[in-house]
A protein has these predicted regions:
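Short phosphate-binding loop-to-helix
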Residues: 53-98, 106-114, 271-281, 294-295, ...
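Conserved core of the sugar-phosphate nucleotidyltransferase
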Residues: 82, 86, 104-194
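C-terminal alpha-helical cap of glycosyltransferases
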Residues: 118, 201, 519-533
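A nucleotide-sugar donor-handling region in carbohydrate enzymes
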Residues: 182-207, 324-380, 410
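Active-site and donor-binding regions of nucleotide-sugar-utilizing enzymes
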Residues: 224-226, 234, 240, 251-259, ...
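Conserved catalytic-core segment of nucleotide-activated headgroup transferases in glycan assembly
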Residues: 230-234, 238, 362-408
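Acidic donor-binding loop of glycosyltransferase active sites
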Residues: 436-447
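A short, well-ordered alpha-helix in the C-terminal region of glycosyltransferases
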Residues: 505-520
Length: 533
């Protein structure tokens, strides 16, 4: 069977100058349709109809033939039917003629072949690419606007509504004339939304470029009571920054899926590194993010061998594996010992909801205290603080105590809600709202400390473990009162008393120190570096 593909590509595009030869994702626009036609298992010959010397060079270099288009067929009023008919070699007998537009770069060759096969099997005269796009639409009839529907329904319940995409028209050669390519027996072949891009505007160009450069993203993250769950929160924030839905992996031996909370992201448990590596070999991700604390060089070498073309980004990693990473972000540390390491608070990823809250106003007196030690609190600081604040001497102050998803003995701590000036909450979704209702904070040296600083809340901080002792930002020099790892109760309570009675002027000074750091721009900095790899 002889099947001819014709790609019309004139030079005179006015809306987007030089449209057909513009570079998109490393190739001229017309490259994609020529490539599909040449790779097709069913198309036997490929001809490009053009009046562009540049298009002819591209086509011939790729191995396609060219039909130089006469000037009389290059005007805006000339129909595509006449152009296609002119390009057909009349000295050969053809079974099908496939019109392929150069403005559909996202079409897949598998879809093209499936449509040709569908046309042949169903003995169609013409088959047109289309997308099913049901909408509540209207038409004009006798000068009035009338609905194209009988009943208003949600989109998924509306009848099919096919829109031509322009990607291809498969026609029996016998029906193609200078006036038409449409025979009597016509059908449409549905293509995916991603393959339906038809470049007519600069906005379409941007969509096509993004679609052709689609990333395959994976995130490997673990969190529990021992290591904390700030990694989980950060992974979910990063996942929202990509224009694809990442696969989020976690080790089922280390992480309870409940710590992810309510999310529609794709969560995939793995039973150890061996299973993760096997999946990576099959998936071949283009971007792989580790948020698992310290990595070994063996782990990183193994990962790179599975996904050799991927860019690997590590967060909060101070292990030897960092030398094999393409990027390392350590917002909690200050050491930038290698060029790929970006350390310090300017790479902190602020939660989206915090961006909508202004720093608190420092009041004359402290009346309300925020207490939270992250998602896990392995030192049980929450328990110790609750025992302190129920003393009669603190009855005139209000305390908000927030417990995280990985905290143990939550039910016992919720019993403290019986005290009128104490509010104990578990796994809240309105953290910035709660924080901004308070005058001071008491926290550890992880994510919550950064959140309090973002809102300009003077805070006391203590470390949960030896690793947190190395965290650089939550310190006295930046406006916190850091009192060490596992300080004695008398130190904690003494510092709290100092803050409760602290003057407005001193608290304002601490707030100024906290707000001197740009914690809100870290998300942008991180993603710019990732996207520019």
């Amino acid at each position: 069977m002889k099947i001819l593909a014709i790609i019309p590509a004139r030079a005179g595009s006015k809306g987007i100058p030089n449209k057909n030869i513009r570079i998109i994702n490393g190739h001229p626009l017309i490259y994609y349709s020529i490539k599909n036609a040449l790779k097709s298992e069913l198309i036997t010959d490929v001809i490009i109809s053009t009046d562009s010397p540049e298009v002819r060079i591209i086509a011939e270099q790729m191995g396609a033939k060219c039909k130089w288009r006469d000037e009389s067929l290059c005007g805006d009023a000339v129909t595509l039917d006449a152009v296609i008919y002119d390009a057909i070699p009349k000295d050969e007998k053809w079974d099908y003629v496939v019109t392929m537009q150069p403005t559909s770069p996202t079409l897949k060759v598998e879809t093209l072949d499936a449509a040709i096969k569908y046309s042949i099997e169903n003995n169609l005269d013409t088959c047109i690419s289309a997308i099913n796009a049901p909408h509540l639409s209207w038409r004009e009839e006798n000068g009035q606007k009338v609905p194209n529907y009988e009943k208003r329904l949600n989109r998924q319940f509306l009848p099919a509504n096919y829109l031509e995409t322009g990607a291809f028209v498969v026609s029996k050669a016998s029906v193609v004339t200078a006036e038409t390519r449409i025979g009597k027996k016509v059908d449409v072949y549905e293509v995916s939304e991603q393959e339906a891009v038809d470049i007519d505007t600069f906005a379409d160009l941007r969509v096509a470029a993004m679609s052709l450069n689609t990333q395959k993203v994976a995130i490997y993250v673990n969190g529990n009571n021992k290591r904390g769950i700030g990694h989980i929160y950060r992974a979910l924030e990063i996942a929202d920054e990509f224009y694809v839905k990442p696969d989020i992996y976690y080790d089922s031996n280390q992480t309870d899926p409940k710590v992810f909370g309510k999310t529609t992201h794709i969560l995939k448990p793995v039973d150890g590194i061996a299973e993760l590596f096997q999946i990576c070999k099959e998936k071949q991700y283009t971007v792989f993010i580790n948020d698992i604390l310290t990595t070994s060089i063996d782990y990183m070498i193994g990962l790179k061998s599975c996904i050799p073309n991927a860019k690997i980004i590590n967060f909060e990693d101070d292990g030897e594996g960092i030398i094999k990473a393409d990027l390392v972000f350590n917002a909690l540390f200050e050491d930038e010992q290698f060029p790929q390491i970006h350390a310090g608070e300017k790479y902190y990823i602020c939660g989206k909801t915090f961006m909508f809250y202004e720093p608190i106003t420092i009041k004359e007196k402290v009346t309300k205290v925020f207490i939270s030690f992250g998602g896990a609190d392995p030192q049980n600081y929450s328990d110790r603080l609750l025992e302190m604040i129920i003393k009669p001497e603190y009855k005139d102050y209000q305390f908000v105590v927030v417990l995280g998803r990985a905290k143990y003995n939550v039910d016992a701590l919720l019993e403290y809600n019986k005290y009128p000036n104490v509010e104990v909450l578990y796994d809240v979704s309105n953290m910035p709202e709660l924080m901004t209702s308070c005058d001071i904070g008491i926290t550890s040296r992880g994510r919550t400390g950064y959140e309090l600083a973002t809102l300009g809340i003077p805070s006391i901080a203590m470390a949960q473990n030896h690793r947190e002792e190395k965290h650089g930002f939550v310190c006295n020099e930046n406006g916190f009162s850091y009192i060490g790892l596992n300080p004695a109760d008398e130190v904690i309570e003494g510092t709290m008393k100092m803050y409760l009675s602290m003057s407005q002027k001193t608290r304002q000074h601490y707030q100024d120190m906290l707000l001197s750091h740009d914690l809100r721009g870290g998300r942008r900095r991180v993603m710019n570096l990732i996207n520019n790899l």
